[in-house]
Amino acid sequence: MSNQSVKTDMIIVGAGPVGLFAVFEAGLLGLKCHLIDNLDRPGGQCTELYPEKPIYDIPSRPKVTGQELVDDLLKQISPFNPVFHLNQQAQSLERLENNNWQMTTSQGEVLEAPIIVVAAGAGSFVPKKPKYPDLEIYEEKSIDYAVYKMSKYQDKELVIVGGGDSALDWVMSLEPIAKKITLVHRREGFRSSP
């Protein structure tokens, strides 16, 4: 943690696909970028929620997984040497007398740039954990909040909780490899898209 600010051309809040592509576009203009993201790796929801799930709505890509998309974007921006500030959030933003912006992260890093890009998508990914005593004992053993490797669920009996797009997408994606899937949902109808 340093109070001395790091000066750059552009600060991007969010290291998902839009933030990564912003690095590419800025790089073409000769701008240096620093990215801030709450997660421990670039990729946003693509790597956090569906790294192995096919995505069908990326221009020029008939089908690509979330991880493949992020890997390709990281290759595309590597010549521009972006600096990542991971596992932290943008905490404060202040306009300076020189008309630059000063952003402080949750870890106390101070960045300064004339350009701020907010590419935060749906915001930082924080799972909605049920209020259940000692739940953390089972996390990463038998409770997962995201699917990172589908092969982990091969021939397993699974319980998926939720009624939104993500829950139903994972039921459909895991159905061919799981032994059994039970979907638990507390409402009468589903919130997912048709």
What are these regions (language model features)?
Residues V23-E25, T47-E48, K128-Y132, V171-S173:
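Short amphipathic alpha-helical segments
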Residues M1-V13, L28, R41, F84-K156:
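FAD-binding core/adjacent interface of flavoenzyme oxidoreductases
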Residues S2-K7, I11-D40, S142-R191:
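Rossmann-like dinucleotide/flavin-binding elements
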Residues L29-G30, P51-K53, Y132-E136, P176-A178:
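Glycine-rich, phosphate-binding/catalytic loops in enzymes
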